[in-house]
């Protein structure tokens, strides 16, 4: 009967589930009216870049093809199951939000959107990124290895995209998109914490890969993500590949620390990182807009 009746069996995941409930948001909360007026302020190169990023983000879950359900069923835990049910629900909200953004970027032309999505699948930078990650997913045999690859997907795979989108806030453009990016990147930070907790609490130390294997995995992940943004971000307003690489290295070190590993780079985050805007508390007039404050205030993303 213990499998049928709920009993709190993992305090950490029970707390993460509550945190997810408190921070729940919906695609309808993202109003893109002002963003439509900002489109004319983007030059052709910038508009193409952001079309590419959002198309990639909208397709990413299907492209990676990581079976989270298979991973979760490895554990007999009500709280782990409950948390990942909530996480999957939030991923659906992300997908709906990206669909709304693409609808705006392509002016409602579904045929053009589909043709563009099909065309970028031949992009070398995207193919290199997807192929690398698919190879890692396929090569992960043990449970700890699978969780570590999942951790990379949550914590590294989208960082350069989130960073680049956050630069629109620096330019005073796309308030709806920036709010969505704020929410989604914070959700992914929570998902990264969950994957770290899964690794730390649900795998035996004797079964975990060697430290050298883990560091090599993270090192190549940072290289692949850097190459991705380097290939696609050239000539885009404010996109600084060196700063993004610095942020990627700092993020990798933070995640490695979360799973009890030594830092790989010793790199601090860039001084003017646009994602630090996520940590600021905003005073919101209820009658002007919904509050975008997130109950999980991130004091230091890294």
Curated annotation (Swiss-Prot):
GO terms for biological process: deoxyribonucleotide biosynthetic process; DNA replication; release from viral latency. Fe cation 1 binds at residues 61, 91, 94. InterPro entries: Ferritin-like_SF, HSV_RIR2, RNR-like, RNR_small, RNR_small_AS, RNR_small_fam. The chain crosses the membrane at residues 147-167. One of its GO terms (cellular component) is host cell membrane. It catalyses: a 2'-deoxyribonucleoside 5'-diphosphate + [thioredoxin]-disulfide + H2O = a ribonucleoside 5'-diphosphate + [thioredoxin]-dithiol. The active site is at residue 98. GO terms for molecular function: metal ion binding; ribonucleoside-diphosphate reductase activity, thioredoxin disulfide as acceptor. SUPFAM superfamilies: Ferritin-like. It holds the Pfam family Ribonuc_red_sm. Fe cation 2 binds at residues 91, 154, 188, 191. It is a single-pass membrane protein. It is found in: Host membrane. Keywords: DNA replication, Host membrane, Iron, Membrane, Metal-binding, Oxidoreductase, Transmembrane, Transmembrane helix, Viral latency, Viral reactivation from latency. It is an enzyme of class 1 (oxidoreductase). PANTHER family: RIBONUCLEOSIDE-DIPHOSPHATE REDUCTASE SMALL CHAIN, RIBONUCLEOSIDE-DIPHOSPHATE REDUCTASE SUBUNIT M2. Heterotetramer composed of a homodimer of the large subunit (R1) and a homodimer of the small subunit (R2). Larger multisubunit protein complex are also active, composed of (R1)n(R2)n. Ribonucleoside-diphosphate reductase holoenzyme provides the precursors necessary for viral DNA synthesis. Allows virus growth in non-dividing cells, as well as reactivation from latency in infected hosts. Catalyzes the biosynthesis of deoxyribonucleotides from the corresponding ribonucleotides. This is Ribonucleoside-diphosphate reductase small subunit. It comes from Epstein-Barr virus (strain B95-8). The gene is RIR2.
